[in-house]
């Protein structure tokens, strides 16, 4: 079993979970080897990685038959598997059956809650861990901070921050400092608490700077974001593609477009546009929002790959600056190139038709949407269609759409 376990572990560690599960099957079928606790753990990890709940349940039943359901390592693997597959009630059920709950078991449950957006459950579990005297590690603290950020609960985030400082984790793990800055920024505290947390970091890497810049941008503090971007480079920190994405968003106003153009030149100099195609979409958006539609179109034409986001960003730019005809031309060209529209594309084009009172094109799009089932699945598209019919004076059709929406 040791040899088989080593092979299975190797596959798991090198990101090949299907091969690991195949070996687990062959080990028993051909060689008649019964898996031990560690082998089960690797098999469960494979199921978690590919979210194969059916195989995971089979393993759970086999674990019970082998009387390993009370083994702490195996149970941690089960909790992790169920949590990653989205079966959080089952993960909690397995968790509650264990008498000795260590930090690893708790963290498996908490990580599952966090991944699936159960932020209150993360914080409840975090508090319960402390009440039960379980020693928290840096990862558990980070899960707590991320939940506070996503729920915008700065008060509890401040309490977690105090505990992190007491344990001295900021000095030993730079990642937790970045998560701390992000938490305060998401709570809307970027101009005070996020800045203070950032300034107190023992060392600041590109992620630290980018997190603070992102916080400024999200709070519409463009001047502060640009100042921070310039300072990080003065300190010898090279921006990454995420930093550039944020700073381009900060330059989406006419008063800072010159800075945006300089950043664009810097991006081209680093060859980032080719390596990170989404940067091109952000550039299209920046120029469009600054009213430089010719420049926006130029960036668009130079893209090696034009996806639905590229097309939609350009279409929205034309619509917002009143060039309805060009917005429709782009929409037609997009379809000619075989790019399928998304919700944002359809909403914008319907608004364009309403603005132009172009009933013919609007009805054509309506027919297309009915065939694709858009009206059944998307309230935003239905609402835009309703608005278009009203602007075109088609009250019976508008009433029918209204009835469908409600």
Name what the model sees in each region.
Residues 97, 197-204, 208, 214, ...:
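Long hydrophobic segments that form regular secondary structure
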Residues 31-32, 67, 98, 102, ...:
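Inter-helix linker motif
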Residues 3, 23, 59, 94, ...:
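Alpha-helical solenoid repeat scaffolds, predominantly canonical TPR units
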Residues 4-5, 9, 20, 36-41, ...:
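Pentatricopeptide repeat
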């Amino acid at each position: 079993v040791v040899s088989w376990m080593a092979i299975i572990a190797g596959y798991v560690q090198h990101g090949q979970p299907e091969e690991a599960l195949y070996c687990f099957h062959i080990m028993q079928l051909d060689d008649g080897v019964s898996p031990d606790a560690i082998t089960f753990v690797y098999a469960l990890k494979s199921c978690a990685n590919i979210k194969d709940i059916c195989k995971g349940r089979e393993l759970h039943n086999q674990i019970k038959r082998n009387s390993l359901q009370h083994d702490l390592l195996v149970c941690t693997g089960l909790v992790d598997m169920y949590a990653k597959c989205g079966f959080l009630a089952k993960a909690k059920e397995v968790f509650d059956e264990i008498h000795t709950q260590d930090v690893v078991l708790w963290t498996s449950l908490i990580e599952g809650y966090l991944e699936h957006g159960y932020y209150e459950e993360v914080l409840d579990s975090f508090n319960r861990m402390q009440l039960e005297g379980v020693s928290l590690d840096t990862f558990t603290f980070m899960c707590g901070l991320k939940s506070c950020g996503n729920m915008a609960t700065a008060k509890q985030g401040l309490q977690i921050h105090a505990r992190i400082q007491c344990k001295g984790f900021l000095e030993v793990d730079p990642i937790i400092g970045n998560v701390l800055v992000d938490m305060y920024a998401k709570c809307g505290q970027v101009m005070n608490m996020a800045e203070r947390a950032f300034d107190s970091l023992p060392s600041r890497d590109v992620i630290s700077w980018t997190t603070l810049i992102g916080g400024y941008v999200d709070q519409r503090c463009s001047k502060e974001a640009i100042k921070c971007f310039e300072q990080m480079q003065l300190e010898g920190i090279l921006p990454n593609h995420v930093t550039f994405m944020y700073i381009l968003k900060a330059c989406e106003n006419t008063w800072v477009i010159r800075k945006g153009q300089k950043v664009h030149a810097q991006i081209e100099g680093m060859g980032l546009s080719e390596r990170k195609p989404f940067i091109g979409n952000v550039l299209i958006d920046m120029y469009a929002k600054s009213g430089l539609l010719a420049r926006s179109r130029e960036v668009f034409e130079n893209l090696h790959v034009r996806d639905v986001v590229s097309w939609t960003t350009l279409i929205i730019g034309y619509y917002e600056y009143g060039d309805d005809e060009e917005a429709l031309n782009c929409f037609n060209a997009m379809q000619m190139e075989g790019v399928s529209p998304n919700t944002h594309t359809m909403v914008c084009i319907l608004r364009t038709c309403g603005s132009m009172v172009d009933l013919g094109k609007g009805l054509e799009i309506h027919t297309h949407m009915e065939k694709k089932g858009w009206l059944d699945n998307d309230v935003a598209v239905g609402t835009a269609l309703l608005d278009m019919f009203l602007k075109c004076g088609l009250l019976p059709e508008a009433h029918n759409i209204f009835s469908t929406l409600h």
